[in-house]
Amino acid sequence: MQYRFCPRCAGPLATQSIESIERLVCSAPGCGFVHWDNPLPVVAALVEYQGQILLARNAQWPRRIFSLVTGFLDQKESPEHAVMREVKEELNLESTVTHFIGHYPFVEKNQIILAFAVQACGELKTNHEIAETKLISIEQLKIYDFAPLYLTSAIVRDWLTR
């Protein structure tokens, strides 16, 4: 989204180089607003369920593309709580974070992905965001083609080499 006016004073925004990065700044005298455009944190869950890895296909994605469960953090929510909440909301499963896998910049969407491994249990029931799920073994995961989801591939690779 490209803003045109200052959210503080409604003055026009202009581009200015700050610390060698082009930023939108308010051109109204005395305002001083800078749109820093910080990346949005997103959590991703590599879900271990019934001795296998659970992959999910978002309802808006093509048929063959499966990935991890992902979602945004709520205000004042820790990433660990957010990832367990997303697993509950999207899959109806209780989960426990087993470990932090890593952080991954998703430059195209201005997001930072915080990936966690979770152990899940309960009765699987998807919500409206998930079109379908599949369970695969760790051996299958090692050779699974996540293209074009390069970040999912990186997260899985890092989890496998833990």
Model regions: which residues?
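Acidic, metal-coordinating catalytic segment for phosphate/diphosphate chemistry
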Residues: 2-44
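Conserved hydrophobic/aromatic beta-strand scaffold that supports enzyme active sites
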Residues: 5, 25, 46, 55, ...
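A short coil-to-beta-strand element that immediately follows conserved catalytic motifs
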Residues: 16-17, 93-102
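Short acidic/glycine-enriched loop/turn segments that link adjacent beta-strands
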Residues: 20, 62, 107-111
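Conserved Nudix-box catalytic region and its N-terminal flanking loop in Nudix hydrolases
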Residues: 48-89
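Active-site-adjacent beta-strand/loop module that shapes the phosphate/pyrophosphate-binding cleft
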Residues: 104-126, 134, 138
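NUDIX/MutT-family hydrolases
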Residues: 126-157
